[in-house]
């Protein structure tokens, strides 16, 4: 919802029907470090553990270049999102869809922005269901080797059960503690991943050649690797919603604390991503797993702790990505269908949504391939070219200026990643589905 000051009577009515974290609430108590750990929680997740696997298909030079280029381009587009939040004096675009309406028009904007944002948010929630269950299973198997093995689908169900409870937290600010814990865990398990790889050392006869597959399969796997890298930069889809929790005054607009938080988040991002991608690939080469923790076996207690940290982190990540979806669903039920806003509506809409993502996650546990598919189809638009397109429309930089060129580079790279990794991810899901048992 677009917020402005003063608030009109119609907007005041809408505000009273909304959650406390939504745009119209005058209380915006978040500090700059809130945006740091919210952004870290949204951005650093399951994707960091698949970066060495992407390196195995891209190689040292191209892989490092793609990772560095992606980091730089998405930092620039994140800066654009922060600046565009209050690009109209007296108005705050508190949601991605609000900015889309302003840039593309009230009719076209939602059709361009909302599907992409929902793909990111719902896609992340599905992937995090799979990741949480998979790592929870790994944790128990390491700590209790004599326990009776339990099917992975049951662990995913157990992980999903946590979200039936946490999803009832009313607003973004109420999940701040969960998000902070998740951000700390991401830094910890990333350190364990690259630190454990150093302690493990290089495997005998390590090879840095491209993974041995037929030419057609290799091409699709490279496409999927691009999607896995783009998945690692998914925070843009909730950037405006995070900034909406920041106070703003003429002397200190919200873009100041938000940008401070983003810089902090990207520093943490670099500290996590580059060591994991490069060191873990150095240790295992083309034999690295799509979840690098699977390659580490010793010390057992440390690997078990890392898996548990991943579980805690994706619990927080799920909530960060789900909260805007909850807001959208509840507003739709109130405004379009006349439901009364309250605890009952919150319980049913959020429970149904969690059950939906849980069902899809249990049915399609293709962790690595899901990363590539959703990474290209959803994250490339929201993180690469949609911010750049909106910047060109709203700010209208001089043609052939540095800003103009940087935006067009982001657009071209983003479109290529979207097409390539979506094709590669879908093809790999189809190919690998024969090796999995549904509800395994």
From Swiss-Prot:
GO terms for cellular component: plasma membrane
Keyword Magnesium: no
Keywords (A to Z) from UniProt: Amino-acid transport, Cell membrane, Membrane, Transmembrane, Transmembrane helix, Transport
Comp. bias (Basic and acidic residues): 11-25
Similarity remark: Belongs to the amino acid/polyamine transporter 2 family. Amino acid/auxin permease (AAAP) (TC 2.A.18.2) subfamily.
PANTHER family: OS05G0424000 PROTEIN-RELATED
Descriptive protein name: Lysine histidine transporter-like 6
Source species: Arabidopsis thaliana
